[in-house]
Amino acid sequence: MSSVSQARSLGKYFLLMDNMLVVMGFYVVFPLISIRFVDQLGWAALLVGIALGLRQFIQQGLGIFGGAFADRLGAKPMIIAGMLMRALGFVLMGIADEPWLLWLSCALSALGGTLFDPPRTALVIKLTRPWERGRFYSLLMMQDSACSVIGALLGSWLLRYDFKLVCLAGAVLFVFAAIFNAWLLPGYRISTVRAPMLEGMRRVLRDQRFVTYVLTLTGYYMLSVQVMLMLPIRINEVAGQPAAVKWMYAIEAALSLSLLYPIARWSEKRFRLETRLMAGLTVMLLSLFPIGLIEDLRALFMLIGLFYIGSIIAEPARETLGASLADNRARGSYMGFSRLGLALGGAIGYSGGGWLYDVGNRLEIPQLPWFMLGLIGFITLLGLYRQFQQRPIEPAMLNGRGEGS
């Protein structure tokens, strides 16, 4: 095995270990925020939605700057600093008793993610070949599902005692992740050239096709982020106890571990990436329409399972499409900007979802937010269809963008 191949092989094991710590640290805390502040403390869902949307918008919206810094400075210092900043945000969240404190803690957590997320994503592109990238994304997503359940179970158990313990556990996991990166991550350059930071950002903004694709995904993310806000609230309403939320993540893990990789392997041989993304989005939006009408917990979990199946179909294709369109001369900047759709979708999805939930309760129309989310998904589907019909997306190795290391 050549030294380059060995480095790629070891690097992928490192990425999996790092991803485990990050996902567990995140899911210990964030799925329980709406339960803690809306159900236990009685805050308006809009206030909590603003906090979650702020976190999403700052982390993903400023990702292009984090990516540009990583292109210039390398991945390691950005990742370590970002993980420590997120740990600090979690500590502050544990003592939040006013909305502004929750917003500040979410902002700190988001700034940490702005620093570590783009270089981590760029490392995946650097350490995988184009033809194996889709399968590696599937493995990461399977791991995400398993670790999210472990994190949510740990957080739910700790919430029975004190929310401060929930936040402390998340902070400790991110400190461990920072130490792990400081100890084992080499000083990789994540782009093929070391250009000025503004050059990488300009290169992204001039790429009209990439920009259009990223912004079109805003509606997709408005649906996907509801696993952190609206779905836990709805489960708690139907079940009457917050502990039932953990079963949502158990369903996700069971479906992902059993279906994600086989579906990815089967579909990549038969369907284009664009088709897989649109098919998954179709399943997601159809599953959301009736949720507000369901009062039986088993039926609700069946719809949530259908939503996750749609995500299982769509997510590997979405990630691979984004990587295929990225210019390797500015990997960090491209991966940072690719999160802008998530920033906008998260901010609108969280705050808008919380607002629609409050309005629906006030008007006694509980299905209002779910109908609107389904409609947004349908509009997004039409936008993607039109974009892909005009010009199908080809893998990066075929469209003239070299695969430098």
Curated annotation (Swiss-Prot):
The keyword Ribonucleoprotein does not apply. Keywords: Cell inner membrane, Cell membrane, Membrane, Transmembrane, Transmembrane helix, Transport. It comes from the Bacteria. Belongs to the major facilitator superfamily. DHA1 family. MdtH (TC 2.A.1.2.21) subfamily. This is Multidrug resistance protein MdtH. Its main location: membrane. One of its GO terms (molecular function) is transmembrane transporter activity. CDD domains: MFS_MdtH_MDR_like (cd17329). The lineage of its organism: Bacteria, Pseudomonadati, Pseudomonadota, Gammaproteobacteria, Enterobacterales. The gene is mdtH. Disulfide bonds: none annotated. It is found in: Cell inner membrane. It is a multi-pass membrane protein. NCBIfam families: PRK11646.1 (NF008650). It comes from Sodalis glossinidius (strain morsitans). The chain crosses the membrane at residues 13-33, 34-54, 78-95, 99-116, 139-159, 165-185, 213-233, 243-263, 277-297, 299-319, 340-360, 365-385. InterPro entries: MFS, MFS_dom, MFS_trans_sf, MFS_Transporters, Multidrug-R_MdtH. One of its GO terms (cellular component) is plasma membrane.
